[in-house]
Amino acid sequence: VVETDWLGYGIQKQRALSFVETTWALSIDCDEVVSQALKDEILLTLKHPCHNVYRMPRLNHLCGRPVRCAGWYPDYVDRLLRVGEAQFSDSLVHESLVFSCSSGSFSSPLLHYSYDDLDSAIDKLNRYSSLAAMSLKQRGRRFGRLTPPLRMCYRFFYAYVLRGGCFGGLDGFSASLLQAVEVYFKYCKAIRKARDPIF
């Protein structure tokens, strides 16, 4: 176990990657599970790999139930990589792999148990919106007072209508609403941070 100071999700993952001594690395978070089908697909691919990075469809869960709408599935993420061919962005939150090599895709899902209940959903929403606002502040981004409600409305429309959340019942509505509210608070917090650095 390696313990370090916390500088954001991207930097932490890149630090972890620097300790890998194998040819390939699979990055998964503590709330993610490799499905048996994905495991089989990865092992088969690694016998004769054609690419240096592979992405997989992440199946997000809300209160224990899979949500296949509102942009939550397929939520593709690059997670399997040949060490040295890619690195993680230095984003505080919503980090991603940066690479210029060829990439491939798996069809089997990575299971993401992101929200065990509504309490954990609200806690995570608050934490992620704070980190995203801090990232916007670090990049010197400034926004007007109408930005939070307008971005929130667009995000809800995008998730609920354009990405099919309306076909997912209460789970589809909840997933769409969670995305919209996170966007709203991200921009509210960014505006507040720009006015008051202590916030």
Can you name each region flagged by the protein language model?
Residues 4, 28-30:
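Cofactor-binding loops of NAD(P)H-dependent oxidoreductases
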Residues 2-9, 14:
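Short, acidic/glycine-rich phosphate-metal binding loop used to engage nucleotide
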Residues 11-18, 24, 28, 35-197:
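Catalytic-site signature of metal-activated, phosphate-bearing donor transferases
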